[in-house]
Amino acid sequence: MCSLITQLCDAGQLADYVGLGWLNAVSSQPYLVQALGLQPPPRRVDVDAAFRDAEGLHGHQPWVATPLPGRTVRALFIGINYYGTSAALSGCCNDVKQMLATLQKKGLPINEAVILVDEDNFPGRTDQPTRDNIVRYMAWLVKDAKPGDVLFFHYSGHGTQCKSRGDSDEKYDQCIAPVDFQKSGCIVDDDIHKLLFSRLPEKVRLTAVFDCCHSGSIMDLPFTYVCSGGEQASGTPHMKRIREGNDVLGDVMMISGCADEQTSADVKNTATFGTGSTGAGGAATQCITCMLMNNQSLSYGKLLIETRDMLKRKGFKQVPQLSASKAIDLDQTFSLTEMFSVDRSVQ
């Protein structure tokens, strides 16, 4: 079936990611065994150059779904297994398959998708997830976005930290590791923020999922979910401003696999999560996609709580985080396409 799907993509036809997401995959070792550790500060991204490089780039339509009239839907998927290196993982490309399958089954009408993975026979693959490609396609994702448009971003791979360059109050910057990070360096949270948000207009909806270590604040968004009495406590959840000066015009929400100081785990057999998939994959991606598929009317708050609870029941210590560009009304029904209702009591 894998070869059939690849042949269909090569022939310009659409891949069945729902079917692909349910295929068997090779078992893996946990991400935790292969944590990268502290990395040297990388060179900064030239954001203007990235947007120039994004001119003329295009994605492909991954499936046919009922369109959103007058609105464009773009998506960027990144999965990196670091094949043949000391940093090798096994489940990250499977995470992308699982996320694609989930969005296809939910009927998200993606007009253009870009898939950056280091798995050569991945159906619909755009290119390798090198530093240069990730940077230019981040710019592509938001380039020319207009009010009403919908954007989706998914990253599964290594996340790590580097010492801050001193331009923030934080001791460490969070960063993601491209497939060529040992040669070209990582991409820090400050640059991720600038690439995705510096030119994002109002009333654009962007959802991001980061399944990697040290990802809690990797987008440097100003508001985060908190719960009185601790992250797993039963107190009243609410949004809290944690940053000044990082305001974003668009409606952006990120779910990360863990807090900044934590690592994100892999599982050898994702069948234990009941998502329909098997083989290696990220625990956070499996829980998030399970929640999206099996609960049609979850609120933003419940989506995070249920994801955390599922991980805890299965013995994982990581605590997924929710951050946003605005103080989301956590009782609002979660949507990939609709703008936020805002909790006006949060300043």
UniProtKB/Swiss-Prot annotation:
Post-translational modification (record): After processing, the propeptide and the large and small subunits remain associated by non-covalent bonds. In vivo, the unprocessed enzyme appears to be the predominant form.
EC number: 3.4.22.-
Enzyme class: hydrolase
InterPro entries named among the record's database cross-references: Caspase-like_dom_sf, Metacaspase, Pept_C14_caspase
Location within or outside the cell: Recycling endosome
Knockout or disruption consequences: RNAi-mediated knockdown causes no defect in the growth of the bloodstream stage form. Simultaneous RNAi-mediated knockdown of MCA2, MCA3 and MCA5 in the bloodstream stage form causes a growth arrest resulting from a block prior to cytokinesis; DNA replication and mitosis are normal. Has no effect on VSG protein recycling. Triple knockout of MCA2, MCA3 and MCA5 in the bloodstream form causes an initial slower growth rate in vitro which reaches wild-type levels after several weeks of culture. Triple knockouts have a normal growth rate and virulence in infected mice.
Pfam family, one: Peptidase_C14
Annotated PANTHER family: METACASPASE-1 (PTHR48104:SF30), METACASPASE-4 (PTHR48104)
Free-text comment about domains: There are 2 calcium binding sites with high and low affinity, respectively.
Similarity section: Belongs to the peptidase C14B family.
Protein name, as recorded: Metacaspase-2
Originating organism: Trypanosoma brucei brucei
Annotated gene: MCA2
